[in-house]
């Protein structure tokens, strides 16, 4: 099992969670404005310590309905070169504006396809 970062993180990217992770399993794109964080499912130890630190509730335990988020995380890390993040950074500039919006991945990032 692993934890996954879900749609709530898209266009917000609060990073409170990364500093509490005991195994440093969070990743981000190289650009400052990359749209979200992901958890490396091969590194996550399923401790859940990050969950209460996410101010928008974007981190959830893996479940059948969230498998697509596990696959996206793997794709971003393995095929798009996302790098490990271990220190808290400022959230994206419009994070407060987008934090309550639903279905953000499909609206704004849907063109990002998972590699086969």
UniProtKB/Swiss-Prot annotation:
Cofactor note: Binds 1 [4Fe-4S] cluster.
Limits of the 4Fe-4S ferredoxin-type domain: 2-31, 35-64
Keyword Iron: yes
Binding, [3Fe-4S] cluster: 9, 17, 54
Keyword list, A-Z: 3Fe-4S, 4Fe-4S, Electron transport, Iron, Iron-sulfur, Metal-binding, Repeat, Transport
Binding positions for [4Fe-4S] cluster per the UniProt entry: 21, 44, 47, 50
Domain of life: Bacteria
InterPro entries with a match to the protein in the record: 4Fe4S_Fe-S-bd, 4Fe4S_Fe_S_CS, 7Fe_ferredoxin, Fd_C, RnfB_subfamily
SUPFAM superfamilies the record matches: 4Fe-4S ferredoxins
GO MF annotation list: 3 iron, 4 sulfur cluster binding; 4 iron, 4 sulfur cluster binding; electron transfer activity; metal ion binding
Keyword Transport attached: yes
Cofactor dependency: [4Fe-4S] cluster; [3Fe-4S] cluster
PANTHER family: FERREDOXIN, OXIDOREDUCTASE
Function: Ferredoxins are iron-sulfur proteins that transfer electrons in a wide variety of metabolic reactions.
Protein name: Ferredoxin
């Amino acid at each position: 099992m692993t934890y996954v970062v879900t749609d709530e993180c898209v266009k917000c990217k609060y990073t409170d969670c990364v500093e509490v992770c005991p195994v440093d399993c969070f990743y981000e794109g190289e650009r400052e404005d990359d749209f979200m964080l992901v958890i490396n499912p091969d590194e996550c130890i399923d401790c859940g310590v990050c969950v209460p630190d996410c101010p928008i509730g974007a981190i959830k335990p893996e479940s059948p309905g969230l498998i697509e988020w596990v696959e996206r995380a793997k794709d971003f890390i393995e095929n798009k070169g996302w790098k490990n993040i271990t220190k808290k950074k400022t959230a994206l500039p419009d994070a407060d504006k987008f934090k309550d919006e639903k279905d953000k991945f499909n609206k704004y990032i849907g063109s990002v396809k998972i590699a086969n």
